[in-house]
Amino acid sequence: MFVNRWLFSTNHKDIGTLYLLFGAWAGMVGTALSLLIRAELGQPGTLLGDDQIYNVVVTAHAFVMIFFMVMPIMIGGFGNWLVPLMIGAPDMAFPRMNNMSFWLLPPSFLLLLASSMVEAGAGTGWTVYPPLAGNLAHAGASVDLTIFSLHLAGVSSILGAINFITTIINMKPPAMSQYQTPLFVWSVLITAVLLLLALPVLAAGITMLLTDRNLNTTFFDPAGGGDPILYQHLFWFFGHPEVYILILPGFGMISHIVTYYSGKKEPFGYMGMVWAMMSIGFLGFIVWAHHMFTVGMDVDTRAYFTSATMIIAIPTGVKVFSWLATLHGGNIKWSPAMLWALGFIFLFTVGGLTGIVLANSSLDIVLHDTYYVVAHFHYVLSMGAVFAIMGGFVHWFPLFSGYTLNQTWAKIHFTIMFVGVNMTFFPQHFLGLSGMPRRYSDYPDAYTTWNTISSMGSFISLTAVMLMVFMIWEAFASKREVSTVELTTSNLEWLHGCPPPYHTFEEPVYVNLK
């Protein structure tokens, strides 16, 4: 029974739960790695060992957080749980493929962990640039294991993307147009399209790297007519859409949370929100070289990538102001989920502004590979994606479990986390402006103060993580069941009660559309 339910599952709710548990576990691993980084940088001098081991930790931290925490939780966890419920589908379009998508992830994670334990580990950074990732600078199996790990995670995501696209387009009630589906469903659809287009390019790039390392090809080796810059183009053509893949489902969740706790029946500017997400998805594919301003591109190329990157700020601004307009005049309920959503809007905007700074190719020459970049992307990830995940979790936890979290603890948890992440990453802007480079395990004494403060902030965030584990335990131990749910047209996932029955929408849904 246990094996049939949890290993051979074809139920979108159970698979969503598996994704959430896996992502939570990976999140703990990623947090542990990040604390190793901040412990090393807490004061000048060496703590862990040489720079190779430090870079292995940095690389693993990035891969774990991106491929095994944010994507499984947002797309696999919330996506699987909510999309079928929101469109009235009995399950996903391909339930067994759904199960395979999940079970490809633990072996992938295993390969990544193995890569850090054989030879010297993969100390390449998550970008895995050759020649550093070649078989000279990284002899041994480490980088090959990392590449195989990425292959598995990529296949998992591609299959998941096919599944979500088919489900969302094909399994709605016949009377329901695509423009009547909730914004979270839209965000997952657009994310899935991005995955489907971006991941094959990454697969091509890392497969060429694999053959360069093992079969004497020279795709990225100038000695044989190759070019390492080709790898950078291939990687970032995936890498930039990837960062939008990480944030778009968060946009969808924030739209639902803000609408719900503002007492509104619909978000402000629904069509504007949809088109903004589609614009972001499209523009995300034509700005990749802004990661490469320092490799010596033509001035006209740099001008194009600078302006194209800045244009992404427009649809993003549409979303931010639509969230604010949704709040406007609402009967705002200061629930923990709403606090996460408001924190998201503020901090994501701050991260977006530093992104506009970095979009300037001339400024980026100075700021590239400094802590300014680290601060920028941790504001949009550690305070964008993670805040959206936390907000979505405390909002939908009663739906998933049938129990309610302690609201006071949840607000305290938000406060600790808010202080922790800001204390960690705000000082890094100053470090970057003073020229402290990324990916070094040591630094001149002049940078000590801000690094010490940053490392203290990371340990505050750690207490927040531990408090969250306690909150979840407390909710299951206290068993406060959900009594009533306020239903509107925009939150139909609550229709079947908390938690919903194992099978929902077993017969086709009748939709009466105005």
UniProtKB/Swiss-Prot annotation:
Mitochondrial intermembrane-facing ranges: 41-50, 118-140, 213-227, 287-298, 358-370, 434-446
SUPFAM superfamilies for this protein: Cytochrome c oxidase subunit I-like (SSF81442)
Segments on the Mitochondrial matrix face: 1-11, 87-94, 171-182, 262-269, 328-335, 401-406, 479-514
Chief place where the protein resides: mitochondrion
One of the GO biological process terms: mitochondrial electron transport, cytochrome c to oxygen
Assembly and oligomerization: Component of the cytochrome c oxidase (complex IV, CIV), a multisubunit enzyme composed of 14 subunits. The complex is composed of a catalytic core of 3 subunits MT-CO1, MT-CO2 and MT-CO3, encoded in the mitochondrial DNA, and 11 supernumerary subunits COX4I, COX5A, COX5B, COX6A, COX6B, COX6C, COX7A, COX7B, COX7C, COX8 and NDUFA4, which are encoded in the nuclear genome.
General function of this protein: Component of the cytochrome c oxidase, the last enzyme in the mitochondrial electron transport chain which drives oxidative phosphorylation. The respiratory chain contains 3 multisubunit complexes succinate dehydrogenase (complex II, CII), ubiquinol-cytochrome c oxidoreductase (cytochrome b-c1 complex, complex III, CIII) and cytochrome c oxidase (complex IV, CIV), that cooperate to transfer electrons derived from NADH and succinate to molecular oxygen, creating an electrochemical gradient over the inner membrane that drives transmembrane transport and the ATP synthase.
Family: Belongs to the heme-copper respiratory oxidase family.
Protein name: Cytochrome c oxidase subunit 1
The species this protein was found in: Ceratotherium simum (White rhinoceros)
